Amino acid sequence: MQFQNGSPENTDGRLDKEIRVYDFLDKLRVEYQRVDHEAAMTMEACEAIDRVLGDDTAICKNLFLCNRQETDFYLLLMPGDKPFKTKNLSAQIGSARLSFAKPEYMEKYLDITPGSVSVLGLMNDHEKKVQLLIDEDVLKDPYFGCHPCINTSSLKFSTKDFTDKIIPALDHPPITVKLPLPEEQA
C-alpha cells in the first residue's frame, strides 16, 4: 500500500459514488492523499491502513444510528479506541435509546453499504435526514482519515480542511459530543 496524491488517474472499475467524492473534494480544493487496499470491513481490518496513514491521522469509527421509531438518524464519528455505549450518547443529544440503523436506511440516505460508512456519504443526504455527531477527540489530530464511500480506498486530508471546507460543504452542521474513555465509564 502506498499513498497517491489526489484522485486516481484511471477511474475504470471505480464506482460512481467514489468518483463523486473525488470530484467533491477537488471542487473544494482540498488536498488529499489516497491509498487503495483490499476491502476493510472492520476497525481491526483497518489497522494496516492506519499504519500507512500515520499516527497524526484521526481514524474513526463511523456509526450509523437511529432512534427506536426509525425517524431520527445520526452519523457518529468517534475514535476507534473508544467503546460505544448508547446511554452516554443518548443523554447528550436528548434522544431515546439509540440503535444501529438498518442497512437500507444507510443506502437510502448516504448511498453507502455496511463496512463503507463515511462522513463523505452526507453529500448524498439531500433531504438532510441524518444528523452529524462528532466526538471532540476526533478533531484533535492534524489529519483526518476516511473512506471515499467505498471501503477499498482510504483518504487523508487536514483536519483544518475537514472542519473549514468539507463540513460546511456537506451542509450538515455537526453536534460535538464527548464520549467517555474506557477508564471513565462506570
Regions found by a protein language model. Give the residues of each.
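Extended, low-hydrophobicity, polar/charged segments
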Residues: M1-A186
